[in-house]
Amino acid sequence: MLWLWLGLSGQKLLLWGAASAVSLAGATILISIFPMLVSYARKWQQMRSIPSVARAYPLVGHALYMKPNNAEFFQQLIYYTEEFRHLPIIKLWIGPVPLVALYKAENVEVILTSSKQIDKSFLYKFLQPWLGLGLLTSTGSKWRTRRKMLTPTFHFTILENFLDVMNEQANILVNKLEKHVNQEAFNCFFYITLCALDIICETAMGKNIGAQSNNDSEYVRTVYRMSDMIYRRMKMPWLWFDLWYLVFKEGRDHKRGLKCLHTFTNNVIAERVKERKAEEDWTGAGRGPIPSKNKRKAFLDLLLSVTDEEGNRLSQEDIREEVDTFMFEGHDTTAAAINWSLYLLGTNPEVQRKVDQELDEVFGRSHRPVTLEDLKKLKYLDCVIKETLRVFPSVPLFARSLSEDCEVGGYKVTKGTEAIIIPYALHRDPRYFPDPEEFRPERFFPENSQGRHPYAYVPFSAGPRNCIGQKFAVMEEKTILACILRQFWVESNQKREELGLAGDLILRPNNGIWIKLKRRHEDDP
């Protein structure tokens, strides 16, 4: 009997202890999340007056309405901006995170001109394992210092040195496309992307990886795999926690991919540092000029030389951050713009004829390389690229995390809100672009651009955090398009609704860009 009593008493004590532990854990969790709940409730109350796309529910917000498929979600977001275009801003709650969508020039200006609202969205943190805290992902004093150091490296006179690389890789691309002349329609997206990757590798790192000739190299495969994994992780909140992410195969693949990319970049940097040291030793020994190796200067060489106001140089980790940032930002966006240009020219033959006429005036029938003077003369092609970026901006939306309360469109928007700027919708404002779905490069003639709101068109963002590489991007786009269009006539029967637009960090066609090629001059070899 005593043993039974002791056993029952022991069980009660264990149950009481377990219950106490659970209660203590629950109380600890409640105490830790209580401030967040208070902050959430305050934001909910303060932002009640901002128009909402639909009824939001506490904690889950509008998540129940959101389409899980990426292409469908982007179309849903665009639908909201069209449905509520008469409103200055609209509000969405993604779980406990408030978002305001901005698609009117006067409201976009408020955010982009602010010297305080420069923090990128929290989603950019998923780029940090690869890019570190480089120019794209850093903020505050680090971003300001780094931006000031790097701006001179994008001066036009320096960019001119990269034109040879662009010409060489564009010619390789043209040769690759030859096999499709007078054949069935083909998907050109991957061809253009590999060309852009070759260009950014050689201009950023001074390394010719030959992606167009060997697209199965480990580095090339890892660059694309890493980009896809980052996009997917951003959309899946259950993968946001690092330790939990590593439980999944993709998390482990991500870790292996990072090692591959960082090892490659570190080796390139170390190799170039060693070469520079040998060059310094050679000249320091009084041996005269270094025997010419015909080695081109790359961004990497500039990064190894730049200093801040106090004369400090970038560390190897700093340099790797920026080189990797150039790699990430410098090929996908440019490749997308070129692909969209080919699609729009292929569906608008009257525009393509005007481009051909301009190319003939500048180049005649020659196949010589494109020069900087040629690029300056290609004014109509420049308008074609601008109009392409209006209709299909390479970056269809981007975000700022508000670092303080501000007023936008007559509404108070609280600190911590994600301000989503949507160039895809902004560029379709009929106040500034009548018949916005029509492709009209003439919109960007100087006489037609007068009086247009400066923030009605922001394909490269604007304000303090605008794209530092936009001149490089436009130079590359014009060079590649000029090389392709001097040789080929482009046709496309693909309808807009067949593209399958997906708005990740880059505006992509899920179904590819399908074109046909004909030789412009039948007597060409």
Curated annotation (Swiss-Prot):
<keyword id="KW-0443">Lipid metabolism</keyword>
<keyword id="KW-0349">Heme</keyword>
<keyword id="KW-0521">NADP</keyword>
<comment type="pathway">
    <text>Lipid metabolism; fatty acid metabolism.</text>
</comment>
<dbReference type="Pfam" id="PF00067">
    <property type="entry name" value="p450"/>
</dbReference>
<dbReference type="GO" id="GO:0020037">
    <property type="term" value="F:heme binding"/>
</dbReference>
<keyword id="KW-0256">Endoplasmic reticulum</keyword>
<dbReference type="GO" id="GO:0005506">
    <property type="term" value="F:iron ion binding"/>
</dbReference>
<feature type="transmembrane region" description="Helical">
    <location>
        <begin position="14"/>
        <end position="34"/>
    </location>
</feature>
<dbReference type="GO" id="GO:0102033">
    <property type="term" value="F:long-chain fatty acid omega-hydroxylase activity"/>
</dbReference>
<keyword id="KW-0472">Membrane</keyword>
<keyword id="KW-1133">Transmembrane helix</keyword>
<comment type="function">
    <text>A cytochrome P450 monooxygenase involved in fatty acid metabolism in the eye. Catalyzes the omega-hydroxylation of polyunsaturated fatty acids (PUFAs) docosahexaenoate (DHA) and its precursor eicosapentaenoate (EPA), and may contribute to the homeostasis of these retinal PUFAs. Omega hydroxylates saturated fatty acids such as laurate, myristate and palmitate, the catalytic efficiency decreasing in the following order: myristate &gt; laurate &gt; palmitate (C14&gt;C12&gt;C16).</text>
</comment>
<keyword id="KW-0503">Monooxygenase</keyword>
<dbReference type="GO" id="GO:0005789">
    <property type="term" value="C:endoplasmic reticulum membrane"/>
</dbReference>
<dbReference type="InterPro" id="IPR036396">
    <property type="entry name" value="Cyt_P450_sf"/>
</dbReference>
<feature type="binding site" description="covalent">
    <location>
        <position position="329"/>
    </location>
    <ligand>
        <name>heme</name>
    </ligand>
</feature>
<keyword id="KW-0560">Oxidoreductase</keyword>
<protein>
    <recommendedName>
        <fullName>Cytochrome P450 4V2</fullName>
        <ecNumber>1.14.14.79</ecNumber>
        <ecNumber>1.14.14.80</ecNumber>
    </recommendedName>
</protein>
<keyword id="KW-0479">Metal-binding</keyword>
<dbReference type="InterPro" id="IPR017972">
    <property type="entry name" value="Cyt_P450_CS"/>
</dbReference>
<keyword id="KW-0408">Iron</keyword>
<feature type="binding site" description="axial binding residue">
    <location>
        <position position="467"/>
    </location>
    <ligand>
        <name>heme</name>
    </ligand>
</feature>
<dbReference type="InterPro" id="IPR001128">
    <property type="entry name" value="Cyt_P450"/>
</dbReference>
<dbReference type="InterPro" id="IPR002401">
    <property type="entry name" value="Cyt_P450_E_grp-I"/>
</dbReference>
<keyword id="KW-0812">Transmembrane</keyword>
<dbReference type="GO" id="GO:0010430">
    <property type="term" value="P:fatty acid omega-oxidation"/>
</dbReference>
<dbReference type="InterPro" id="IPR050196">
    <property type="entry name" value="Cytochrome_P450_Monoox"/>
</dbReference>
<comment type="similarity">
    <text>Belongs to the cytochrome P450 family.</text>
</comment>
